[in-house]
Curated annotation (Swiss-Prot):
Short name of one Pfam family: AAA
Organism: Spinacia oleracea
Name of the protein: Ribulose bisphosphate carboxylase/oxygenase activase, chloroplastic
Keywords of this entry: ATP-binding, Chloroplast, Nucleotide-binding, Plastid, Transit peptide
Entries under Gene3D superfamilies matching the protein: 1.10.8.1070, P-loop containing nucleotide triphosphate hydrolases
Subcellular location: Plastid, Chloroplast stroma
Length: 472
C-alpha cells in the first residue's frame, strides 16, 4: 500500500508509488529538495474537468485579445511627447525626410512642458484657509528634494522666503507644514542674539539635531527660522554687528555645506545625522552676509501675492463672517497697495463697536472684575454684521492712520516746537477737528481792543490792534 504525502505548496495529492516501494516509504517533497525541483504531473489519469475548464479560459482570453482598439481606452500618452521620445531612437529608414516635419514635435518647447505639464494639481486648501499654489509648490518641492537621494546634484539646504511686510509669509509656511503633516522646529530672530557669546550658534545646532532625531525616528521634520535678518543681518547704522551675528552666519553656512555632519560641543562622532531642510523668512535678504545667500547654500523665493492670491486669502479671513465673495473682491480691489495683514486688522477693527458697547454697559470701573476675576468668564460677542459699506469705512480709517505715520515726523519737531506738526491736517481738511487753534490753522484773526479796562473793549478780538481808548 502506498501512502500519499502532501507537498509544500501543492493542492493535489502526490501520485501513487508504482515502483514496488514499501508501504512506509515516503515521497521526497519539493520543500525538502529545494525550489529548483521540477514537479511532474501524473499524465496516466488525466482530469477531464480540469482540461475542460482550462480550455474555456484560454478561449475567453483569446476572445478578449481580439479587440485591437481596447488599448485606446487606457492610452494616456501624448502624441507630441511620443514623437520627441522617438527622435534619434528610430531608424531614419522608417521616418519621412527631414524636412517633412513628421518626426518634428510641434509643441516640444520648454514652455509647453513647463506650462502644460507642470500643473498645480495639489489641494491648496487647508480647511477654510487658502494656500497660494506657487507658494505651496516652492515649499513642497524644496522639502521633498531634500529628503531624496539625487545623484551628483547639490541641493540647497536653505530656502529663503522673502518679500514685503505683512504678506503672510510665515502663515503660509505654517499652512504648508500642516498640509504635509510636519511639526517643524521653530526659531525666531530673538533667539539669534544672547548675552553669552556663541550661545545662538549652539542653539541652532541643537535645534537642527533635534529635527534630525525626529527624522531618524520616521517623522518628517524641518527647521523653521522666522525673520532671519533682524537677528543675523545689518539693519543700517542703528544696529551693532556682534560676535553672535558672525557665528550665526558661519554656523548656517557650515550646516548648509555639511548637512549630515552637524556636531554639538562635546559630542564628536562620525555617525551621520539626517538631512534637515531649513526654511527662513525675512523682508530684505540684502542685509545678510553675502556668502550665506549664494545659490549653492540658499534658494531664494520672492513672495509677492497676486490678485488671485489676495482674494483667496481674504476669502478665508472673512469666511466666518459670511461676507459674499463679490464683496471680498471689491474690498481687495479698493485697497490694492495694502498688505494681506491689512485686511485682518480691518476685520478686527469692526469689533471695536461691540467692545465699546460692552464697556459702556458694565462701566469702566468694572472692566477688570468682569474680565479677570469673574465666575462667568469673559463676555462672548455675537458676530457683527460686516457690510461692504462698513468695511470700506474702516479701511479708509486705517489708510488715514498709515498716512499720518508717514507724514508726521514728530521726532524731528519734538524739540523744535510744541505744535503737533501736520498730525491733524487730515481732520482739518475734513472739518472734523474742533480744537482749531489760531497758531496752527491759517484762519483770519479778529483784531480789536483786547484790554478789558478800555472803553472800546472787544471780547471777540484775538489780536490787539492798538485802538483801545480810555476814560481819563
Amino acid at each position: 500500500m502506498a501512502t500519499a504525502v502532501s507537498t509544500v505548496g501543492a493542492a493535489t495529492r502526490a501520485p501513487l508509488n508504482l515502483n514496488g516501494s514499501s508501504a512506509g516509504a515516503s515521497v521526497p517533497t519539493s520543500g525538502f529538495l529545494g525550489s529548483s525541483l521540477k514537479k511532474h504531473t501524473n499524465v496516466r489519469f488525466p482530469s477531464s474537468s480540469r482540461t475542460t475548464s482550462m480550455t474555456v479560459k484560454a478561449a475567453e482570453n483569446e476572445e478578449k485579445n481580439t479587440d485591437k482598439w481596447a488599448h485606446l481606452a487606457k492610452d494616456f500618452s501624448d502624441d507630441q511627447l511620443d514623437i520627441r521620445r522617438g527622435k534619434g531612437m528610430v531608424d531614419s529608414l522608417f521616418q519621412a525626410p527631414a524636412d517633412a516635419g513628421t518626426h518634428v514635435p510641434i509643441q516640444s518647447s520648454f514652455e509647453y512642458e513647463s506650462q502644460g505639464l507642470r500643473k498645480y494639481d495639489i489641494d491648496n486648501m487647508l480647511g477654510d484657509f487658502y494656500i497660494a499654489p506657487a507658494f505651496m509648490d516652492k515649499l513642497v518641492v524644496h522639502i521633498t528634494k531634500n529628503f531624496l537621494n539625487l545623484p551628483n546634484i547639490k541641493i540647497p539646504l536653505i530656502l529663503g522666503v522673502w518679500g514685503g511686510k505683512g504678506q503672510g509669509k510665515s502663515f503660509q509656511c505654517e499652512l504648508v507644514f500642516a498640509k504635509l503633516g510636519i511639526n517643524p522646529i521653530m526659531m525666531s530672530a530673538g533667539e539669534l542674539e544672547s548675552g553669552n557669546a556663541g550661545e545662538p550658534a549652539k542653539l541652532i545646532r541643537q535645534r537642527y539635531r533635534e529635527a534630525a532625531d525626529l527624522i531618524a525616528k520616521g517623522k518628517m521634520c524641518a527647521l523653521f527660522i522666522n525673520d532671519l535678518e533682524p537677528g543675523a543681518g545689518r539693519m543700517g547704522g542703528t544696529t551693532q554687528y556682534t560676535v553672535n551675528n558672525q557665528m550665526v552666519n558661519a554656523t548656517l553656512m557650515n550646516i548648509a555645506d555639511n548637512p549630515t555632519n552637524v556636531q554639538l560641543p562635546g559630542m564628536y562622532n562620525k555617525q551621520d545625522n539626517a538631512r534637515v531642510p531649513i526654511i527662513v523668512t525675512g523682508n530684505d535678504f540684502s542685509t545678510l552676509y553675502a556668502p550665506l545667500i549664494r545659490d549653492g547654500r540658499m534658494e531664494k523665493f520672492y513672495w509677492a501675492p497676486t490678485r488671485e492670491d489676495r482674494i483667496g486669502v481674504c476669502t478665508g479671513i472673512f469666511k466666518t463672517d459670511k461676507v459674499p465673495a463679490e464683496h471680498v473682491v471689491k474690498l481687495v480691489d479698493a485697497f490694492p497697495g495694502q498688505s494681506i495683514d491689512f485686511f485682518g486688522a480691518l476685520r478686527a477693527r469692526v469689533y471695536h463697536d461691540e467692545v465699546r458697547k460692552w464697556v459702556n454697559s458694565v462701566g469702566v470701573d468694572n472692566v477688570g472684575k468682569k474680565l479677570v476675576n469673574s465666575k462667568d468668564g469673559p463676555p462672548v460677542f455675537e458676530q457683527p454684521e460686516m457690510t461692504l459699506q462698513k468695511l470700506m469705512e474702516y479701511g479708509n480709517m486705517l489708510v488715514q492712520e498709515q498716512e499720518n505715520v508717514k507724514r508726521v515726523q514728530l521726532a524731528d519737531q519734538y524739540m523744535s516746537s510744541a505744535a503737533l506738526g501736520d498730525a491733524n491736517k487730515d481732520a482739518i481738511d475734513r472739518g472734523t477737528f474742533f480744537g482749531k487753534a489760531a497758531q496752527q490753522v491759517s484762519l483770519p484773526v479778529a483784531q480789536g481792543c483786547t484790554d478789558p479796562e478800555a472803553k472800546n473793549y472787544d471780547p471777540t478780538a484775538r489780536s490787539d490792534d492798538g485802538s483801545c481808548t480810555y476814560n481819563l
